[in-house]
Amino acid sequence: MPTAPQPLAIEAADGYRLGGLGWFGAPGPARPVAVIHAATSVQCRYYSRFAAWLHARGHDVILYDYRGIGLSRPARLRGLRASWADWGARDAEAALAYARACFPDRPLDAIGHSFGGWAIALAPSAVHLRRIATVGAQFAYWRDYAAGQRWPMVLKWHVAMPLITALCGYFPGKRLGWLEDTPAGVVRDWAWPTPRFETRPGGRRLLREQGRYPAAAVRAPLLAISTTDDPFCTPAAVERMLAYFPASPSRHLRIAPGDIGVAQIGHFAFFHSRFEGALWPLVGDWLAAGAEASRTASAR
């Protein structure tokens, strides 16, 4: 029977309280800890089955919600200070620091989905990571979107979303069936049309505060996984993100749905339980031993 998660309360450096979930087993210095960083406006509960699976394989696992989302949502989103920069430098940092404080002698790994991979790049404690795995990770530069879907995506995410956000004071994603409701500052960072994160509103502010992004000092080996049918995460988008990790030995593993005998995977389905056998071991094997786990996927 899967272990039930424990509710977590994680306090960021600015005092904001984040909600999360933890899967913990018998303590031991060799048992690694993995922190999972979610995609933009995806509740951390979405990753619960994957977290339970990873826990059964020998990791303790921490999930958390960014400020404004899920277990970390306040009563009112309008006026909430929350940007992609805050989600990385404050919230992802808080989760990694929490893991280090609770388990100071354990190996620490990180998994990032979509924006979650970029959140790791902005967290100072990422320098302490042993290994990193990302899935569909990028920071939404519009020219990197898949050519056949680029303009509809630009219209939706870079025109309609910021306009609706300006009218409402936050993005009412639930009502539209797009995402969770999302803070305005996050939408601003996402929709900004520049290819470098440091030229986006949150990125500029963060660079002034940090001097450089923590990713520059990260040395943990990094496996970046993408799929050929993910319109957000093209090879150009992955390489754009990996360029911020110059000291990390990195490998980009690109998977076609046909490699595992399915019609589609897309941007979100990697963590669906139907891919427990075909895709999850790519991450699990990498974290466990640094294995490239290319049995089911082809590198491109």
Residue ranges and their predicted role:
Residues 111-198:
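Alpha/beta-hydrolase-fold enzymes
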Residues 44-76:
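Conserved alpha/beta-hydrolase
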Residues 234-244:
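Short alpha-helix in the alpha/beta-hydrolase fold that links the catalytic acid
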Residues 31, 39-42:
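Active-site glycine-rich loops that stabilize anionic/oxyanionic intermediates
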Residues 251, 255-300:
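Catalytic active-site module of serine/aspartate enzymes centered on a nucleophile-bearing elbow/loop
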Residues 218, 224-226:
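Short beta-strand/loop motif that positions the catalytic acidic residue
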